[in-house]
């Protein structure tokens, strides 16, 4: 089974509940950035995400309120670096009590401190950032030794009984051969899930490491072939989309983002505006416009946070797609 059964059943119940209520749009994942403080300055990250003052972090109460307001069954704790957040352990506890499934996204540098304070739980996944093998990952993180630390923390997390997965961004220079080498390593360690995302131009960053549409299609055509050999978390229909074999509208409301600046609209990557309240965010963003991908910043986007929800949203339109997804979830 690709995901734990409770994740699948929670998602199904949430979708059925919203459809019964007649809700056309509803979030499935809360991307919670409790702080913009980080111990790295990775090349794919905008400055505001790693230069924030820890004193400007969200309070524990604000984080819990975001959980309750969005109602999303999945919580992704990102940032910034979440393991720096002083209230991380009680935040995870509060999310578990609300029967959310938590992905703790981390670079791994301070993960051993979290392990000392927390305990494994079926509703908690440790999601370690790994953008390739040693040379590539340390280059992306702009610091030597980060790869070795991440791998050590993956080993330790697994030995302690945590569910550990990884998150990888593919850049222009990244070879698919290296991605497969990384997958071989992670599989040998016992990692059960690997999320792969294309790095693309969405902001005016001083880097040319991001890919455009043609480059994304070429690399993800090869990554699609790897999905039969390794436990890739991306759905097969999303990988076909990233490979240029099918089209989807965006679903920016599927993964909503709460930050120290407010609710980020329209999506995780594009900060057109920050809203002080959930109600203002949910009712003010022009979802129709952003779904159509007409904005210039959306042209090269194949981000899983925008299009995995689209896969689910459009799934009922094809029996073949439903069968593909059923095999992927229950027979792999």
Label every PLM stretch briefly.
Residues 2-117, 121-122, 328, 332:
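Conserved alpha-helical substructure of the radical SAM core
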Residues 34, 108-109, 130-134, 321:
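Short, acidic/turn-prone active-site loops that include or flank metal/cofactor-
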Residues 48, 78, 129, 197, ...:
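Conserved residues at the C-terminal ends of beta-strands
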Residues 51, 81, 132, 200, ...:
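Flexible, active-site-proximal loop/turn residues at the rims of small-molecule/cofactor binding pockets
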Residues 52, 84, 112, 135, ...:
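Generic structural signal for helix capping and beta-alpha/helix-loop junctions
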Residues 58, 68, 98, 122, ...:
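Radical SAM enzyme [4Fe-4S]-AdoMet core and its adjacent flexible, acidic
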Residues 231-331:
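Accessory C-terminal segments flanking Radical SAM cores
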């Amino acid at each position: 089974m690709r995901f734990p059964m409770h994740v699948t059943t929670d998602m199904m119940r949430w979708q059925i509940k919203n459809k019964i209520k007649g809700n056309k749009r509803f979030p499935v994942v809360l991307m919670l950035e409790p702080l913009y403080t980080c111990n790295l300055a990775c090349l794919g990250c905008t400055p505001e995400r790693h230069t924030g003052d820890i004193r400007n972090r969200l309070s524990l109460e604000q984080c819990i309120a975001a959980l309750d307001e969005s109602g999303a069954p999945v919580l992704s704790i990102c940032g910034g670096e979440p393991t720096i957040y002083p209230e991380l352990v009680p935040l995870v506890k509060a999310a578990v009590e609300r029967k959310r499934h938590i992905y703790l996204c981390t670079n791994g540098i301070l993960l051993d401190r979290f392990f000392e304070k927390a305990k494994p739980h079926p509703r908690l996944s440790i999601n370690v950032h790994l953008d390739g093998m040693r040379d590539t990952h340390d280059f992306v993180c702009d610091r030597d030794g980060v790869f070795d630390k991440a791998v050590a923390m993956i080993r330790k997390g697994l030995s302690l009984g945590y569910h550990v997965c990884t998150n990888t961004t593919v850049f222009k220079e990244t070879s698919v051969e290296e991605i497969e080498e990384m997958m071989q390593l992670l599989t040998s360690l016992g990692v059960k899930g690997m999320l792969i995302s294309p790095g693309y131009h969405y902001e005016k960053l001083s880097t040319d490491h991001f890919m455009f549409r043609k480059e994304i299609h070429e690399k993800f055509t090869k990554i699609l072939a790897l999905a039969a050999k390794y436990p890739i978390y991306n759905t097969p229909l999303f990988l076909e989309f990233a490979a240029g074999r099918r089209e989807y509208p965006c679903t920016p409301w599927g993964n909503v983002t709460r930050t120290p600046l407010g609710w980020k609209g329209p999506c995780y990557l594009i900060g057109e505006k920050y809203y002080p309240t959930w109600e203002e965010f949910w009712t003010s963003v022009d979802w129709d416009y952003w779904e159509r991908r007409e904005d210039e910043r959306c042209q090269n986007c194949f981000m899983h946070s925008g299009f995995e929800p689209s896969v689910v949203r459009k799934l009922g339109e094809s029996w073949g797609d439903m069968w593909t997804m059923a095999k992927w979830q229950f027979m792999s």
